[in-house]
Curated annotation (Swiss-Prot):
Cofactor: Mg(2+)
Protein name: Receptor-type adenylate cyclase B
One of the GO BP terms on file: intracellular signal transduction
Protein's organism: Leishmania donovani
Lineage: Eukaryota, Discoba, Euglenozoa, Kinetoplastea, Metakinetoplastina
Tagged with keyword Nucleotide-binding: yes
Stretches assigned to the Extracellular side: 55-898
GO molecular function: adenylate cyclase activity; ATP binding; metal ion binding
Residue ranges of the TM segments: 34-54, 899-919
Length: 1331
């Protein structure tokens, strides 16, 4: 609840001055403390003069002796036939609570109830009270009275006001009587709270557009509540109710003129407020039987609950209506006995049961009609009469639900009264009693029903410190109960309450709800499912986030007529709505409601309506992105740029409009116009799909999905592109049809989205997207991980953000908030900029109507949806939607066309003559279109290499040939797909150049996923890799194999076949065209840096330098799972380089980066290829062991007789034979160290190959590979795996190298070594010198 005011409600009673008739006015209004004080003084003086004949003991309160009874007058009665039983039930509840304490007050003083003399005129409540005062001078208080009329009469009596009597728990039906008066002690919440509970339910649950309010004028009941009702409904943007009002009369006739005026509005909810009387009873009968009102919800106040119950079931038993569960909903300030969680109700049941059995004062025959209705329509079985008192009590409670609730209300008041009499000094006289009652009292009844705080006059300091001032009522809450099978049941979350700091609810308002409405197309199952998806998603999101800023309600309306007008009527006729979500149709203009992310059964162009806000990609945006990213689409199967659009079920004007926009997109990016085919709705699109082209299909149906799948299975190069709306609607059908098809088919069904991948539940995806984390936590069921559910969650969150903004600026329009904010971010997902309006300048007028805001749109395939490790097809793009004319040469003049025609014949002859020569000359030419050629623009270079290729060739020669061929095919296909350029290959290594850093990164990541998914036809490669890792465990103390100890399931998900490492770097290069190779090559620092980056990576790992990483846009970086590896040292680089691991396959673990310490360092002018550089000579003198050490000793012994220079020359044939590179010697390295380094390197190679060949036969079966002592320049290096691995990335580790200035010599695939002085130490090569 919201409380705007903290001032208590106080009454400056005109009746205190003896002015007659004032009671019929509203007696409650705000007044200052000064005014209140003045009026109290004046009133006191007037009262003194008016009651000079009253005994003085009345004012001060006579002091009672310690054994004298505590006298209380029972004024809880009514003389009306309609109200007498009502008041009787309240009194029995009060009496049962006093019976429970033995009618005993403090120090054993008996409590004596004074019953009015039946011979007196009981209608004159003032006379009844004055007579009791006269007969019992120590009378402490009055219980009651019953009804607002009698209470008003008491309050205008000067004698009673001056007596100091406390009126305890008066039963009133209108808030007009609730005001500060020190003689009144209310023990029920004010009736205004009942109105608030009703309005809350109407706004949040019924969401009814048409309400009615029925009350009687001329009495306190109704007038004040009608005013409160209108104020509350206006604050929630609800229409004011239709009104039936008639003057109170003893006549029971219904004013049919007033009733007809109300009934003709066809109210959905009718609130009835009034005195329980014959006039109200007749009105209820008319309401429940008139066809205009009989189906409406009936909401009586608590005072009318019993009467409404009886009339309803009397009509049912007479055959005039059929009871409907939940049609009758009553307000109350206490719970019915069916509420299971309330402790005080269990206490009530026990005390009232004992009271019934022991006193016999409860006569069930008084309410026999209620019992008869329950016996016929209720769920209880009447227990046979017996001596069992428990059965008797249980029968009574079951068969008298309304009487029981009245008894509960009375019992709560009686229990509070009993507590006020529990201390002797409180009840010495009326003055002491009243002082106690208003001394900041709070009461707890039955352990959990709280009343209070009650407080009297106090100053501002006390109020500031927390005191409750001028407060004579203790209830602060109300609830609603629904009537189901003659049983009252509390409606969950129907209650309202306000802070106990405030005495009355004046100024307390209800929070505005956020109401969603979704249309359910009942005759179209897929469209209906989309609507239900929105309802489920929004409700679940609200529950998960525990959103309580305002009530959020998601309702649905079933529709069969799907014409725009019918849908408009469905939205606007019956329900209060803020937001319309889900499926809509073109032309359904629902002005006044926000329509975010509309889903169209037949996608169409943006509707320029201010309240339509497109959060998902529009058709125009998707067509723009299609041509902007057409090269990526073409690369899937390497087809040309021809686009064929198929429009299914569109009218001719829509075909023309959509075609025009698509052609503008094609012209903007200098592509030829698409071909267009319109397919009628009576056919499927199968026959219209074009072979070998990109098919852009709109309005896909379930039958179309089957045609598309069959078409793609047959056509190996064709591609089908669908839009986001069709994806949402047909997603279940698409996934079901494609999940069993080959990946090559799944990869050729492509769509658009600006959402994170809904099916990606990996940790890296959650780390990159807050929206995805919330989505999967709120909806953990994998069947709900669909684009429809995710877009619904996002839409709901967007609208909730707009509601918060609207409330903060006291606006009623969510649409206004969208354009006021312009750019909106929800769960870190940006939208906008939304603009709507015109700007006028002295010379011109500019208008912008921009109601769409999707950003970061990507293209992705169904393959990626089924397998999140597959990269998305394109980088994120926020289309500018700036169209340009196609850029091409001017048309030929007529003369030029004539000359061209004349020359065609000659040209044909020439072409035929030179065709053979041209073909011959062009056979060796390379396609250089994709090569970056501008030396002023940065180029991104990739280097790749296969891990342990030498060892694999030695161990599996019969398999490696096919494996290398497959490796080359995969990489070359991807190079073409991403528009990159193959510079050269050296052995199994690739050098690749890309114009775009994102293309390079996407290429590198997809290399890993493609190789993972490739069918290698053998497991021998994986067994060999695992054995290589295990062989290192015994060699290195803290080495932990990254993959060898994985379970089969884990390994199969992360690794398969050849392991390729990739290094990426971006920078400026020296670009040269090679006349021999007829291709472009790239030289300089960028090439060297990329090669060195690849050299430090592990197999299956992609490492990018910070230059490559920051060359990506913010959106591109956000879409890439990565691990920052910190600064790393690279050979030949005089500074540490920040490295980033790209997590192409989530879950892979790698050894630490291969930043080995070099000792054999070439001269500044030395160069080497990327692969050779990665295996430079190690500082291995005295460090190698095992077989390699033995081989090195033999070599050293054999060559020892020769001088050092001759030894180096004699080693060259052996080095060449074993494929070991011999880089030039650096000036910083001695000849002896250089010689020993060459022999060590040769020894390691010999040991590796010989041991690898032993255990693996030609059939591919592997046995234990004992290679723990072998090391190679590529991977079989004992230092390469040093350290342990970490999840999803290699541990950052610095090499500690000291760099020297790099060489200026350009080289495409060679690397400079880092200069480092190796300490002098004796070696086998200089044994002779040592002697």
């Amino acid at each position: 609840m919201y409380a705007d005011a903290t001032h208590p409600r106080r009454a400056c009673w005109c009746g205190a001055g003896g002015v007659s008739g004032c009671v019929r006015q509203r007696h409650a209004y705000r007044c200052s403390r000064l005014l209140a004080g003045v009026l109290l003084i004046v009133g006191a003086l007037t009262l003194t003069l008016a009651v000079s004949t009253v005994p003085a003991a009345w004012a001060a309160g006579a002091v009672a002796s310690s054994d004298e009874p505590v006298y209380l007058l029972n004024a809880m009665y009514s003389l009306s036939d309609y109200n007498a039983k009502h008041a009787k039930a309240l009194w029995l509840g009060i009496d049962s609570a006093l019976h429970a304490v033995g009618y005993t007050a403090a120090r054993g003083r008996p409590i004596k109830i004074i019953e009015p003399d039946p011979t007196d005129d009981l209608s004159d409540i003032v006379a009844v009270v004055l007579k009791a005062l006269k007969d019992y001078p120590t009378l402490l208080g009055v219980i009651g009275p019953y009804s607002d009329t009698r209470l008003g009469a008491v309050l205008i009596s000067p004698e009673i006001q001056n007596s100091g009597l406390m009126f305890l728990g008066p039963f009133t039906g209108s808030s007009s009587m609730r005001a500060w008066n020190e003689n009144l002690y209310f023990m029920r919440a004010e009736p205004r709270l009942e109105i608030m509970a009703m309005v809350k339910h109407i706004a949040n649950t019924f969401r009814a557009r048409r309400t009615a309010f029925m009350y009687l004028t001329g009495e306190q009941y109704g007038s004040f509540e009608h005013k409160s009702l209108v104020e509350l409904m206006t604050s929630l943007s609800l229409d004011p109710p239709a009104v039936y009002s008639a003057s109170y009369s003893t006549s029971t006739a219904v004013n049919m003129t007033a009733f007809d005026a109300m009934a003709d509005t066809r109210p959905q909810v009718i609130i009835i407020w009034g005195i329980p009387a014959g006039q109200v009873e007749e009105l209820l009968k008319v309401v429940l039987t008139d066809p205009r009102t009989s189906s409406a919800y009936i909401m009586p106040s608590f005072a009318l609950q019993q009467m409404t119950f009886q009339v309803y079931y009397d009509l049912a038993m007479a055959g005039k209506l059929t009871p409907v569960d939940g049609q009758i909903i009553s307000s109350a300030t206490s719970f019915p006995l069916t509420e299971p969680a309330s402790v005080h109700l269990r206490v009530f049941r026990a005390q009232m049961g004992e009271y019934m059995v022991k006193t016999g004062r409860v006569d069930a025959s008084l309410w026999a009609d209620e019992a008869k209705a329950v016996q016929q329509y209720g769920p209880w079985e009447h227990e046979a009469s017996s001596s069992d008192s428990a059965a008797y009590v249980n029968n009574f409670f079951n068969e008298h639900p309304c009487v029981t609730q009245l008894m509960i209300a009375g019992w709560i008041s009686g229990s509070l009264i009993a507590q006020t009499l529990a201390e002797e000094n409180r009840i010495a006289n009326r003055t002491a009693y009243r002082q106690y009652m208003f001394s900041q009292q709070r009461y707890i009844v039955g352990e959990d029903f709280v009343l209070g705080d009650y407080g009297g006059p106090c100053n501002g300091v006390a109020e500031f410190l927390g005191a409750v001032c001028y407060c004579n009522q203790g209830g602060h809450s109300a609830v609603l109960s629904r009537l189901d099978r003659a049983v009252w049941t509390v409606i969950t979350e129907s209650g309202v309450s306000f802070t106990q700091k405030n005495c009355y609810s004046d100024g307390t308002t209800l929070p505005r709800p956020l109401n969603f409405l979704t249309l359910i197309f009942a005759e179209h199952p897929l469209l209906a499912q989309v609507g239900l998806t929105f309802k489920t998603s929004i409700s679940t999101l609200v529950a998960y986030l525990q959103y309580n800023a305002s009530p959020v309600n998601a309702a649905t309306v079933n529709v069969t007529d799907t014409t725009p007008q019918a849908l408009h009527d469905a939205v606007t006729t019956n329900y209060t709505t803020d937001v319309v979500v889900g499926v809509t149709v073109k032309g359904m203009n629902v002005d006044g409601y926000l329509v975010p992310s509309p889903i169209h059964p037949r996608p169409h162009l943006v509707e320029l309506l201010r309240n339509y806000v497109y959060l998902m990609p529009t058709l125009e945006q998707q067509m723009f992105v299609l041509y902007a990213k057409l090269s990526a689409v073409r690369g899937v199967t390497s087809i040309d740029s021809a686009v064929h659009m198929i429009l299914h079920g569109y009218a001719s004007d829509e075909v023309a409009n959509i075609t025009a926009v698509l052609r503008k997109s094609a012209a903007t990016f200098n592509y030829d116009n698409p071909t267009v085919t319109a397919v009628p709705s009576t056919k499927t699109v199968g026959s219209a799909l074009a072979h070998g082209q990109i098919n852009f299909v709109l309005a896909v149906t379930a039958a179309d999905v089957a045609d598309i799948v069959d078409f793609l299975v047959e056509e190996k190069t064709s591609i089908v592109v669908i839009v986001f709306d069709d994806l949402v609607i047909q997603y279940p059908t698409l996934v079901t049809a494609l999940k069993s098809k080959p990946a090559s088919v799944q990869a050729r069904v492509i769509t658009f989205t600006n959402l994170p991948l809904w099916s990606d539940t990996s940790e890296s995806a959650h780390a990159a997207s807050k929206l995805l984390t919330v989505f999967h936590d709120a909806l953990p069921d994998p069947s709900q991980h669909t684009p429809g559910f995710l877009s619904a969650v996002l839409t709901g969150s967007f609208c909730a953000s707009m509601r918060r903004l609207a409330d903060s600026v006291h606006s009623t329009s969510l649409t206004d908030m969208v354009y006021r904010e312009g750019s909106v971010t929800t769960f870190a997902e940006p939208f906008g900029r939304f603009q709507w309006g015109c700007t006028t300048t002295p010379t011109d007028r500019f208008c912008v109507y921009h109601n769409y805001g999707a950003q970061g749109i990507v293209m992705l395939s169904v393959q990626r949806m089924l397998d999140p490790t597959v990269p998305q097809l394109s980088s994120p793009m926020t289309p500018t939607m700036d169209y340009r004319p196609r850029q091409r040469s001017h048309a030929l003049t007529p003369a030029q066309r004539g000359g061209a025609i004349a020359g065609i014949a000659l040209l044909t002859v020439i072409l035929l003559a030179v065709a053979g020569l041209a073909l011959y000359c062009c056979m060796d030419n390379r396609n250089n279109d994709a090569a970056p050629k501008d030396g002023d623009e940065p180029v991104t270079l990739l280097f790749t290499d296969i891990e342990s290729s030498t060892a694999l060739w030695a161990a599996l020669p019969q398999l490696m040939s096919d494996a290398i061929a497959a490796h080359h095919r995969v990489i070359r296909q991807l190079v073409k797909k991403y528009g990159c350029y193959e510079v050269k290959t050296i052995g199994d290594s690739f050098m690749i150049a890309c114009r775009s850093a994102h293309s390079a990164v996407s290429l590198a990541c997809e290399i890993q996923t493609k190789l993972l998914k490739h069918d290698w036809g053998t497991e021998a490669l994986d067994r060999a890799y695992r054995e290589f890792e295990l062989a290192r465990v015994d060699t290195l103390d803290d080495y932990e194999p990254p993959t060898a100890r994985l379970s089969e399931e884990e390994y199969a998900a992360l690794w398969c076949g050849l392991r390729v490492r990739v290094g990426i770097h971006t920078g400026l290069t020296d670009i040269r065209y090679d006349e021999v190779t007829r291709g472009y090559d790239y030289y300089g620092d960028t090439s060297n840096m990329a090669a060195r980056t690849e050299a430090v990576a592990n197999g299956g790992q992609v490492v990018a330098t910070e230059a490559a990483w920051w060359a990506l846009s913010n959106d591109e970086r956000a879409g890439i799972a990565h691990t920052a590896m910190g600064p790393q040292g690279l050979r030949g680089v005089p500074f540490a380089v920040e490295m980033f691991q790209l997590n192409a396959v989530p879950g892979r673990r790698h050894a630490a980066l291969r930043t080995e310490i070099e000792a054999i360092l070439p001269d500044d002018t030395a160069t080497d290829t990327a692969s050779s550089a990665a295996g430079a000579l190690l500082s291995s003198v005295g460090t190698i062991n095992g077989p390699a050490a033995g081989i090195a000793f033999v070599l050293a012994s054999c060559f020892a007789p020769y001088p050092v220079a001759q030894r180096v020359r004699e080693l060259q044939p052996l080095l060449s034979k074993w494929g070991v590179g011999a880089p030039p010697r650096s000036r910083l390295v001695s000849e002896e160290d250089y010689c020993q380094g060459l022999m060590n390197r040769l020894a390691i190679r010999i040991a590796t190959v010989s041991q690898a060949r032993c255990p693996v036969g030609n059939n591919g079966a592997a046995v234990d590979l004992d290679v723990q002592h072998a090391g190679t320049a590529e991977v079989m290096n004992p230092l390469l795996g040093e350290g342990s691995f970490i999840s999803d990335g290699a541990r950052a580790r610095h090499s500690g190298l000291t760099a020297v200035p790099p060489s200026a010599e350009p080289s495409a695939m060679r690397m400079r070594r880092v200069g480092r002085k190796v300490p002098e130490r004796p070696t086998v090569c200089n044994v002779r010198g040592a002697h």
